[in-house]
């Protein structure tokens, strides 16, 4: 059987809908041989019970994390691979980032309440890593918010629409979250023994209007080892954009390693599933071997 890999998957430890164990089960079902759980600012998924479960299922699991950073008002995500998930300094640094998210939650909740929305701060604050997605989901699933949502949107919005209209920069409930720069995140990852990869560069072209040259400057500043070139981006019109060929060539030109990731959060009819099984991205066995060799060296 040809190997299949997916190096960017989220779980309920951050903003995914499946537990780490359920992610493993889904990977088995889809015949994906090697995965990396890369939750936001946490490595909580990597507990001994999961490692044992992965061993029983015969899947390769590469320890990973996705750190949220900011530079020049652009939100940049940095992936770390083959990190020491028990490194005490690294765990303390991640804890600091998560604590900043709790401060962010309270500030956003205050603005949302002024706008007429009820937010369950007590429930959300119990999450390991609270994100915009968690807050938006809490808002739009509350019956108490139905009238306000219909007043503001003319209909019941989905999670993404609520975030883009109410919570993003320039919107009424926007709050700037205290975080680290890409360079600082890269240093955290290296100090934990990991490889540094810029997540989904395609997204920064569409969300932040960054040119490839500007993206390259960020890559150079953080001294990234590679980029997540094989990736399906979903734009604001819910259209799939595949620039994998462009970013693979970009990586080759600038002597960067490449990775592949679904950025899986949940099962729906739009976003790629684990392993990008239904997408037109096909890696050769040699390409997969080279990726794994790079990450594990």
Predicted feature descriptions by range:
Residues 55-214, 285-291:
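Extended substrate/RNA-proximal surfaces in nucleic-acid metabolism proteins
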Residues 271-272:
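Cys-dependent protein tyrosine phosphatase-like superfamily
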Residues 1-74, 176-268, 278, 285-295:
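An N-terminally biased module of ancient metal coordination in phosphate/nucleic-acid-related enzymes
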